[in-house]
Amino acid sequence: VLCYHKVERRQELGVTRISPKRFAKQIERLARAGWRALSLSEVIACASGQRTAAPNELAITFDDGYRGLREHAFPVLEAHGFRATCFVITDFAGKLNRWDVAYGGRRFAHLAWRDMRAWQGRGIEFASHTATHPRLTRISELGVHEELDRSRRAMTEALGVGTMAVSYPFGAAGPREERLAREAGYAAGFGIARGWSRSVMSIARTPVYLWAPLTPAVGVLRAPEQLAALVANRCAIGTT
């Protein structure tokens, strides 16, 4: 399961941005190699043991839901017949990313609800990245419940469908957060840079950052890549 963040022309000091040209080349190489991108329900079925992923199957996800995806990522995926899941911060739909540290003073806009509705049914699914992007492990149980529940309700109201999954901000989640996500009505939870998935509420993903090769690593991260991803995550201050 691959995890992207920004696909933008504008540069910044952070590491989560991939240029549109580089993203297009990565997807083109995956398509040429015969990879097939799974839907969210198929990923959940694999993680829960209901199906086995074929050797040429992967999943593509995006965290944060930046507006640049509608111009630079979604059309590329559609052209190659690839599906993807975009995890959105619901309180910031259509707004600037003021929840995040502005490295170099640059702000990036998030997808608006109308953007998401325009891509529904075209291979792009939308799921929760909480309401405001806090590090869930550092807030109260009541706070975690509010973040998860408010986000799920906002998506149902704006998109007309419920969301099956949540991506934990910063990949930070333990047994408490996984339990609360399940209690809030989520069927799956996604982490980051964890190697093997522990359960359907803790699905591991391979982060694709600035330094990623043109052919992204698929499967369990190699030790150096996992260390780099963990360091990047630890250094991500965001709202905490």
Set out the residue ranges of the language-model regions.
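C-terminal active-site subregion of NodB/CE4 polysaccharide deacetylases
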Residues: 1-61, 67-68, 138-240
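Acidic (Asp/Glu)-rich catalytic clusters
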Residues: 31, 75-82, 109-128, 182
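Generic enzyme active-site microenvironment
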Residues: 61-62, 127
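A short, conserved beta-to-alpha structural element at the edge of catalytic cores
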Residues: 81-103
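Short beta-strand and adjacent tight-turn residues that come in two discontinuous sequence segments
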Residues: 87, 129, 189-191
